[in-house]
């Protein structure tokens, strides 16, 4: 059995390709510091993952800082590469600036390359200051964090409630069961309610931050892949809130009544996978591992929170009754 698990793990590790954190610039034609022939009319850039063409742009500048391209950035060979055309370039040094929006997680990445045309040579000392940068800022990280924590608590609570709490209620005895169930119901509703509100607030902040980042309207953001995933996440959050209100009206929460919340939560964490970088590989294995990681984190972290803020206070109520 151990050998089987080892070989399964080995196959997964070997079979998974490198995953980049963002759409970094991998290569270009002409390449960094290269010499291109006089009359060059196009520049091609290649990235580590797919980019959104509507919010991605290449610009070409001459040594005097004048923009000399035709402002016609387009896909070249698939969604991982861009092309821009120029009038026939003359002898000189040119700079290409790249601003691309990830089609996976909605991150903006900036980069630049320099190349010479004809006899012109690139000053290599200038290349030392050239580096890619991701235009992230604190509000984006703050926007996603409460949503991740909230979904972890909801899913972990649903799993532990079904696996442990739902099967142990029969041991409390008929005399104590009514009061215990009432206490459990109150604690469960409070914890999962706060978690779902965190997810909802996080969703609104995420779309607001992305709107500001792209300097566009929320409707335009919804037209991106990030926007489609956000919309799916928002719908699932509303569904979960509906399930929460339905559970709130029940007099007693049995194990089966937690199942709808469990199913919706399992789908909700899949949206986190869709915004993860394993999705950029377009392969099943990285996506599965990312999803399993989110699932196990929910069982562990969400389960601990459920035990600490729902189960233990409920059992403390039982101790008080016995006294």
Regions inferred by a protein language model and the residue ranges of each:
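Bacterial N-terminal signal peptides that target proteins for export
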Residues: 1-5
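Bacterial N-terminal signal peptides
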Residues: 7-16
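Proline/serine/threonine-rich low-complexity linkers at boundaries of modular beta-sandwich domains
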Residues: 15-27
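Polytopic transmembrane helical bundles with strong interfacial aromatic enrichment
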Residues: 24, 56, 72-73, 78-91, ...
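Short, solvent-exposed loop/edge segments of extracellular or virion-exposed proteins
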Residues: 28-33
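Short, solvent-exposed loop/linker segments at the N-terminal edge
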Residues: 34-39
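Hydrophobic core residues within well-ordered beta-strands of beta-rich domains
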Residues: 41-43, 94
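Short, surface-exposed alpha-helix to beta-strand junction/turn motifs within ectodomains of secreted
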Residues: 43-72
């Amino acid at each position: 059995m151990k050998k089987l698990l080892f070989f399964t793990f080995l196959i997964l590790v070997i079979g998974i390709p490198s995953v980049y954190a963002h759409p970094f610039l991998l290569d270009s034609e002409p390449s960094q510091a290269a010499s291109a022939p006089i009359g060059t009319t196009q520049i091609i850039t290649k990235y580590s993952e797919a980019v959104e063409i509507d919010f991605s742009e290449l610009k070409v500048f001459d040594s005097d800082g004048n923009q000399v391209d035709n402002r016609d950035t387009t896909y070249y060979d698939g969604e991982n590469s861009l092309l821009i055309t120029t009038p026939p370039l003359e002898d000189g040094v040119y700079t290409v600036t790249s601003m691309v929006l990830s089609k996976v997680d909605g991150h903006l990445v900036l980069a630049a390359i320099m190349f010479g045309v004809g006899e012109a040579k690139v000053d290599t000392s200038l290349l030392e200051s050239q580096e890619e940068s991701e235009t992230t800022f604190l509000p984006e990280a703050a926007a996603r964090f409460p949503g991740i924590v909230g979904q972890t608590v909801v899913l972990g609570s649903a799993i532990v409630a079904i696996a442990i709490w739902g099967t142990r209620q029969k041991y409390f005895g008929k005399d104590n069961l009514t009061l215990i169930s009432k206490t459990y119901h109150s604690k469960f509703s409070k914890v999962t309610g706060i978690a779902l509100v965190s997810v909802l607030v996080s969703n609104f902040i995420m779309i607001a931050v992305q709107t500001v980042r792209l300097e566009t309207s929320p409707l335009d953001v919804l037209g991106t892949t990030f926007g489609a995933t956000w919309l799916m996440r928002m719908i699932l959050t509303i569904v979960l809130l509906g399930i929460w209100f339905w559970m709130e009206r029940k007099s007693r929460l049995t194990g089966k009544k937690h199942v709808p919340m469990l199913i919706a939560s399992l789908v909700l964490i899949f949206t986190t996978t869709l915004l993860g970088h394993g999705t950029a590989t377009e392969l099943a294995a990285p996506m599965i591992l990312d999803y399993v990681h989110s699932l196990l984190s929910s069982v562990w972290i969400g389960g601990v929170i459920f035990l600490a803020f729902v189960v233990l206070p409920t059992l403390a109520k039982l101790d008080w009754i016995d006294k």
